[in-house]
């Protein structure tokens, strides 16, 4: 199997057929809904909160609310449904989550999307939860993860998952690869390609995205949707603490399995970093969309489908050659 990551690959351009990149359509469909871009901010505590979720939904973007404030989930679903907005939440696999799903079914609170979100998703615990969700909330689109192998994708799809989330530990604040020796860190793009070949349903690429070009590369290698943490962290609206050092403003960003999220030092597979303040989230979303429109124009098409068909090369030394924006 060819092993490579985002920075080892360059996509090869095709003849451009549009007069302006603004003609290129970045929309994507996942389940019963279409969204402005194939991008979703990570369901992490320093990336998304209820206010950001609402803003994203109002503006046609996909979102997944994190699962770290369990009590807030029912009121959140009610509020979003009252506003006529898409509801998309996360669940874990512990005992209490089964009762939570039953409560939703009993109260007629049917979310549009539920993401089963654990670090090692190729497990009986996840398979059991998929089956429980499908039985209790048959109308809900179920995303399950995280996984890193074709076997895992097939097994979760067969259990009833409507989409699988691929990526074990490639994220910027994830240290699974260091703490355990396992994961897709350093070969996330190849893992995505490997999994996508086996998938019959959509795949969400999760982790390792460091540039906007990586979104196009993810689409090329089989992703329907791309989950992004660090590029969405550090904005004005981002949850989390702010600090000022030597006149520079920083915001915190920590992993979902870090001691900062858990509140204890137990099975820690995440860390905390401070990122330079990036301004408004809306500006980043606009820039991301414009860059993706440019990617489509380089691919020689008018929509995301064009990117899926382009040729690519694997470059021996990193394409960035030390360059940063």
Swiss-Prot record:
GO terms for cellular component: cytosol; GMP reductase complex. It comes from Enterococcus faecalis (strain ATCC 700802 / V583). GO terms for biological process: purine nucleotide metabolic process. Belongs to the IMPDH/GMPR family. GuaC type 2 subfamily. SUPFAM superfamilies: Inosine monophosphate dehydrogenase (IMPDH). It catalyses: IMP + NH4(+) + NADP(+) = GMP + NADPH + 2 H(+). This is GMP reductase. Its EC number is 1.7.1.7. The gene is guaC. GO terms for molecular function: GMP reductase activity. Coiled coil: none annotated. NADP(+) binds at residues 203-226. The active site is at residue 174. It comes from the Bacteria. Keywords: NADP, Oxidoreductase. Catalyzes the irreversible NADPH-dependent deamination of GMP to IMP. It functions in the conversion of nucleobase, nucleoside and nucleotide derivatives of G to A nucleotides, and in maintaining the intracellular balance of A and G nucleotides.
């Amino acid at each position: 199997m060819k092993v490579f990551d985002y920075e080892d690959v360059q996509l090869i351009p095709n003849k451009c057929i549009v007069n302006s990149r603004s003609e290129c359509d970045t929309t994507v469909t996942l389940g019963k809904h279409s969204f402005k871009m194939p991008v979703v901010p990570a369901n992490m505590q320093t990336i998304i909160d209820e206010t950001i979720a609402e803003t994203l939904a109002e503006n046609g973007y996909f979102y997944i609310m994190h699962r770290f404030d369990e009590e807030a989930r029912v009121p959140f679903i009610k509020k979003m449904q009252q506003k006529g907005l898409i509801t998309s939440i996360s669940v874990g696999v512990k005992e209490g989550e089964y009762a939570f799903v039953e409560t939703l079914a009993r109260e007629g609170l049917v979310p549009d999307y539920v993401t089963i979100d654990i670090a090692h998703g190729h497990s009986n615990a996840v398979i059991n939860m998929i089956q429980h969700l499908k039985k209790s909330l048959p109308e809900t689109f179920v995303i399950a993860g995280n996984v890193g192998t074709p076997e895992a994708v097939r097994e979760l799809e067969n259990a009833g998952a409507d989409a699988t989330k691929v990526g074990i530990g490639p994220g910027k604040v994830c240290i699974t690869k260091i703490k355990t020796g396992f994961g897709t860190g350093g070969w996330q793009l190849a893992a995505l390609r490997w999994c996508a070949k086996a998938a019959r349903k959509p795949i969400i690429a999760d982790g390792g995205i460091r540039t906007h070009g990586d979104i196009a590369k993810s689409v090329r290698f089989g992703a329907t949707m791309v989950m992004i943490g660090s590029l969405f962290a550090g904005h004005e609206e981002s949850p989390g603490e702010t600090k000022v050092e030597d006149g520079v403003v920083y915001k915190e960003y920590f992993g979902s399995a870090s001691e900062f999220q858990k509140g204890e030092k137990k099975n820690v597979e995440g860390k905390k970093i401070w990122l330079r303040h990036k301004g408004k989230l809306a500006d980043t979303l606009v820039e991301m969309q414009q860059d993706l429109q440019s990617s489509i124009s380089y691919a020689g098409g008018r929509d995301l489908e064009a990117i899926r068909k382009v040729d690519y090369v694997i470059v021996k030394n990193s394409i960035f050659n030390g360059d940063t924006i």
